[in-house]
A protein has these predicted regions:
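Bacterial N-terminal signal peptides that target proteins for export
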Residues: 1-9
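Generic anion/oxyanion-binding catalytic loop in active/binding sites
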Residues: 8, 25, 90
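A structural connector/turn signal
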Residues: 22-23, 87
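Short domain-boundary/entry signatures in modular proteins, especially
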Residues: 80-91
């Protein structure tokens, strides 16, 4: 009996630890980079803007969020934000480049090519009551041709490939 309880405690602890690593939390503010990476895992990308570094933590295709964590010149966490929001999506405009999109939304792991080499589509899933996704269509020159919100079919919010 005692072994079963011990095993249950270990399993529940591991489950809690895996949930804690999905998103940043305010206790990370002021912590160093080593502590951040221990809590969140390795960032997908790192960019430098002005006096701070921006670390991208992309949680797709399984997750619905992308977090940017900002570090100061001493590699300490200044702040964090979840960037897959309608305000961010609405700032994406035709003519922008893929790199500009990544600076605003982070990279996506859900991409599809268009027939006859007409470009590609990036697909961002995000948390919302309508089960919408945000799609960005790029030209072969890697600039935005169009964007759209798409409601996923079916009763559950789950990934449906772009056809």
């Amino acid at each position: 009996m005692r072994t079963a309880i011990t095993q249950l405690v270990v399993v529940l602890s591991l489950m809690l630890a895996s949930c804690a690593g999905y998103a940043p939390h305010d206790q990370l503010i002021g912590q160093d980079r080593v502590t951040l990476v221990a809590a969140m895992g390795q960032p997908e990308r790192e960019t430098t803007t002005g006096n701070f570094k921006k670390l991208h933590f992309v949680r797709s295709p399984s997750g619905w969020d992308t977090y940017f964590v900002y570090l100061d010149e001493n590699d300490r966490v200044l702040r964090w934000e979840q960037v897959l929001t309608e305000d961010s999506f609405n700032s994406i405009q035709p003519g922008m480049t893929k790199d500009q999109v990544v600076q605003i939304l982070g990279a996506t792991k859900i991409t599809n090519g268009l027939a006859r080499n007409r470009g590609s589509v990036w697909h961002y899933r995000y948390e919302n009551p309508q089960c919408e996704s945000f799609l960005i269509e790029f030209t072969p020159e890697d600039t935005i041709r169009s964007t759209e919100y798409r409601i996923r079919s079916g009763r559950r919010c789950k990934y449906v490939g772009i056809g």
